[in-house]
Amino acid sequence: VPIAGLTSKKYADELRKGISLDAVGSKIPAGNPLPFGSGGTSHLSVIDKNGNIVALTQTINYFFGSGVLVPGTGILLNNEMDDLNPKPGTSNSIEPKKRPLSSMSPTIMLKDGKPFLSVGSPGATRIITALTQIIVNVVDFRMNIQDAIDSPRIHCMTDTIFMESSIPKDVQAALAAKGHKLTVRGPVDLYFGGAQAV
């Protein structure tokens, strides 16, 4: 049961579009809550009082993984193998003894040889760009970790720049004027990762 999707305000907003207060409605088709869920990747960061540090990103890949439960254990197997490319001849093609490409990037940073930051995020291929922006915000712009995580993000791996709508309008206009294709998403959008850090 996709609880996160079913209880999502965005999913409720989608369903609400089919309801009219001005006329008798027709039959409303069942919705699809899966796109409104949080997926199957999570991250946690921990530092204890002794300075021991953990950055852990885990995934079952997408929602219920492979859909296979190990009998008697409650353990759900992932479907990470679908991250391999079915086309032969690429660096990520299906082959024996091969692990699929993954963007998971649990990160521990040291300063003067001591733990200084543990950070990671879900978000598929957007994990790398999300973490890069967060780390640059902390290291180069000297933001505290919460401000670094809360700052608006972009993602660009194709000819389109995806960005949160909270990127300043003048920046959006300048990028468009240079010929970039822009896709603007919500102001705080989990599409760009849901980073967690200490």
Name each model-derived stretch:
Residues 1-29, 137, 141, 145, ...:
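N-terminal leader/propeptide and maturation segments of large enzyme subunits in energy/redox metabolism
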Residues 1-59, 72-73, 80, 186:
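Internal maturation/activation junctions in enzymes
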Residues 33-37, 95-101, 186-190:
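Short Gly/Pro-enriched turn/cap motifs at secondary-structure boundaries
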